[in-house]
From Swiss-Prot:
Protein name (Swiss-Prot/TrEMBL): Crossover junction endodeoxyribonuclease RuvC
Entry keyword Hydrolase: yes
Family (UniProt): Belongs to the RuvC family.
Active-site residue numbers: 7, 67, 140
A molecular-function term among this protein's GO annotations: DNA binding
Gene coding for it: ruvC
Reactions mediated catalytically: Endonucleolytic cleavage at a junction such as a reciprocal single-stranded crossover between two homologous DNA duplexes (Holliday junction)
Compartments, as annotated in UniProt: Cytoplasm
UniProt cross-references to InterPro entries, sorted A to Z: RNaseH-like_sf, RNaseH_sf, X-over_junc_endoDNase_Mg_BS, X-over_junc_endoDNase_RuvC
Binding site residues for Mg(2+) 1: 7, 140
NCBIfam families named in the record: PRK00039.2-1 (NF000711), ruvC (TIGR00228)
């Protein structure tokens, strides 16, 4: 099963594609999409949409996992992340893919086993769980891989409980 994890953002959107074979996870591809800083927001969102849609069509993941929007003190940041999430949801829906959403707490618990794990602990666990030599950079990429790992663990749990994905 191929799982595409996405860490939404309008300037930098991290993505990580992992393959789940049995109980093992393998990194397939990870990087980020970037948009030019002074480009109007509608154009940035359109650029991201085209990148995501093309990537999904090329790589053919089975599931898309994305981080849920959480309360942010910076309203402008929260709005732009929400817009980026909308683009992810739209692109996945247009390609007929199911989208699974996880809170930052769920991602931390799934990856590090502790909901208050810091960014460095999560990055180290992503590196270890995927057998990578180095921590993926930038942080958005490591976050996207963590989201994909979280979904892979959720698939295991749902399968054990008899739920279908």
């Amino acid at each position: 099963m191929l799982i595409l994890g996405i860490d939404p953002g309008t300037a930098i959107m991290g993505y990580g594609l992992i393959e789940k074979k049995g109980n093992r996870l393998f990194p397939v591809d990870y990087a980020c999409w970037r948009t030019p800083a002074h480009t109007p927001m509608p154009e940035r969102l359109l650029m991201l949409y085209h990148e995501i849609e093309a990537y999904i069509k090329e790589k053919q993941p089975h599931h898309v996992a994305v981080e849920e929007l959480f309360f942010n003190r910076n309203t402008t940041t929260a709005i732009s992340v929400g817009q980026a999430r909308g683009v992810v949801l739209l692109a996945a829906a247009q390609c007929g893919l199911p989208v699974y959403e996880y809170t930052p707490l769920q991602v931390k618990q799934a990856v590090a086993g502790y909901g208050r794990a810091d960014k460095q602990q999560i990055q180290q666990m992503v590196r270890a769980l995927l057998g990578l030599q180095e921590i993926p950079k930038p942080d958005d990429t490591a976050d996207a891989l963590a989201i994909a790992i979280c979904h892979a663990h959720s698939v295991n749990l749902l399968n054990r409980m008899g739920g279908a994905l």
